[in-house]
């Protein structure tokens, strides 16, 4: 989330006249991320303050966005801790701001933990499984837009910027994933709406108090979501939450906690167990490709902070080398 499109307090106040959320008290740009323009918004209504997030979409179109926004609404209505879109006085949850499609959603409580514990990994695994099950009856459909068709499109554009072993891996792994995605086993894997970007900075935790243990504040930033294999969503999450950041190697204890918590809610199938390593490779490749693309073919942004692509190159190399890697769970289901 970066600030590509600046918005003034006066501009946001005029836009908010279409909502029943009160008057503007503060508007602050969110510098992290690389896709959309985001602001924390504080309003006052009836003597109380309220916190929201306003998002202007820089790449996604008004035709694509209903999938994401109504998915968030659907999940929130099914008890999943996610931001809820706020409808305007006319009932619409999407309207233009500064020439871009925009929305306002509730701000979740808590903070991110970039050094997660095994307990937090288990909490995330449990809620991710519940999110997948809650999305089964979501009626809208849109594929993950950063999957194989996109890799096929952008990898040729990236190749001139990389050389040697890096270029060899980029090309060889694309060929491996083309074979995997084209297999009957891949086609049979269970699927549904997925977050597709559930990194540590997209999850909030409310800290423990004297009266309650630490608990999940929620999942947010659903704007890479799409219908995909559930195992891909798990692999994306494990590749960020359960790794040694210096080497890209998996942390067995954190991974075990996440996978077993997920499996207790939505048991993995035999086919998912067989293709765990393939999917970890796919998840690593997806983010390596997108980071290479953003790094070498950047867009202008007022507060853009591009991610280092070499991290996911290390992660991918580790997954390619890990030939004996399996799902560390009780017996999967058929």
UniProtKB/Swiss-Prot annotation:
NCBIfam families to which the protein is assigned, alphabetical: PRK05231.1 (NF003558), thrB_alt (TIGR00938)
Top-level lineage group: Bacteria
Stated family: Belongs to the pseudomonas-type ThrB family.
Gene3D superfamilies: 3.90.1200.10, Phosphorylase Kinase, domain 1
EC number: 2.7.1.39
Keywords on record: Amino-acid biosynthesis, ATP-binding, Kinase, Nucleotide-binding, Threonine biosynthesis, Transferase
UniProt catalytic activity: L-homoserine + ATP = O-phospho-L-homoserine + ADP + H(+)
Pathway, per record: Amino-acid biosynthesis; L-threonine biosynthesis; L-threonine from L-aspartate: step 4/5
Any one Pfam family match given in the protein's UniProt record, by short name: APH
Biological process according to GO: threonine biosynthetic process
Taxonomic source organism: Ralstonia nicotianae (strain ATCC BAA-1114 / GMI1000)
This protein's name: Homoserine kinase
PANTHER family noted in UniProt: AMINOGLYCOSIDE PHOSPHOTRANSFERASE DOMAIN-CONTAINING PROTEIN, AMINOGLYCOSIDE PHOSPHOTRANSFERASE DOMAIN-CONTAINING PROTEIN-RELATED
Recorded GO MF terms: ATP binding; homoserine kinase activity
InterPro entries, A to Z: Aminoglycoside_PTrfase, Homoserine_kinase_II, Kinase-like_dom_sf, Pseudomonas-type_ThrB
